[in-house]
Amino acid sequence: MKNAVASFGLSKRRSFLGIGLAALLLTACENVAVHNVGVHTAASGTKLEARQVVSLIYKQESLDGLAELAYSGGDLSRAIKRSYNRFPELKPHFERGLIGNTASGFVAVRESSQKDALKQLLRDENTDRAYIYTQTSVAVGHGNDTLSLWEKYASFAFGKEWIAQAPAGWWAQDEKGNWTAR
């Protein structure tokens, strides 16, 4: 009987050791998996936010869609609203080809003769766009030491959407500074 109790105790210790080792391994796997999912989710979240924000602004439908965005609230929503409200003023300049969207997600002047007249309007729009890209980066989990890298990713993700969703005839500037009509 003594041997049976001793072997049960040894067996119990092995079980606990096995469970502990399994838990350690699962924890390590979970951290890797969570990290990989986090990176994937941040990229997908950024692209989704870009698609939704650009669509909301270009379509100029109800701002009720603001609550439907993947990431919204507070100052981010206010920046999106300002861009939404400013768009009717920008639209004729896009349509005449005086301004265009850049690959990096900003608005630039195509016709230098209009630069002074459009300076403040574009400064306001680009300030809000930069803020949207920063806040989207923070919202997807890159608000720490990776913020500056992720802001660049976000600005180009948004830039792609500004260009892709623009009507035919609007101008876009690529990363090399070349302009093409959509």
Predicted features, each with a name:
Residues 19, 118-123:
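Alpha-helical interaction segments
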Residues 30-33:
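Bacterial signal peptide processing site
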Residues 2-17:
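Bacterial N-terminal signal peptides that target proteins for export
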Residues 25-28:
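C-terminal motif of bacterial Sec signal peptides marking the signal peptidase cleavage site
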Residues 36-51:
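Start-of-domain marker
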